[in-house]
Amino acid sequence: MSALDAAEAALAALHPRPYPLPLGRLAPVVEGAFQGFGRTGWVVCGPRERVGATLRGCPVERLVLAASGARPYKLAPCSEAPGNRALHAVGLALASREAVLCLLGTASAASGAFYEACNVAGITGAPVIFVVTVLPLDDRAPVGPQLAGAPAALASACGLAAHTVAPGEIAAAVSSARASARPTLIQVNLE
């Protein structure tokens, strides 16, 4: 059992709120993103991805309430609107003048707030790193396609560095993006 699996099991036993959200196929994305980003700098993510903060030394007890941050570990509180996370990350990057990691999914990228965040990051050069996970949709999905194009294409159009990587390449891509100190979107396609 990996450290992330153990942390996820410990968090589930504490009955996190709003409700337990298992990582499932997102585990390598979360692990790679947190490992590549390191222990310093703010992280903005959803309730599901918060367990990655344990890789920074955050105790699982600090992760029970998704709406609460874990300040000593630079984990921002979760926004109820997924797309707003991108705006919060850009704001944190501009205010701190340090790299900020933001974990998003397709629903976040389909939000107008995501476009606004990419636009502001492109204009200002905010050192934000968006990691956007794209899952394939089949007939069992509760919704149809949410994006007309790829998140990496939208980010590139806004002036961000944009890369599409496999799950095993996330840590290196995040580390490289952090070293570049420029706004970057890393798209991860899960098959």
Language model segments and positions:
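Cofactor-/ligand-binding subdomain signature composed of acidic, glycine-rich
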Residues: M1-L23
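Generic recognition of stable, solvent-exposed alpha-helical segments in well-folded globular domains
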Residues: S2, P28, E116, G168-A172
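A generic alpha-helix structural signal
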Residues: A7-L11, A33-F34, C118, V174-A177
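Cofactor-binding active-site loop characterized by glycine-rich and histidine/acidic residues
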Residues: P16-G125, P145-G159
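Thiamine diphosphate
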Residues: V128-E191
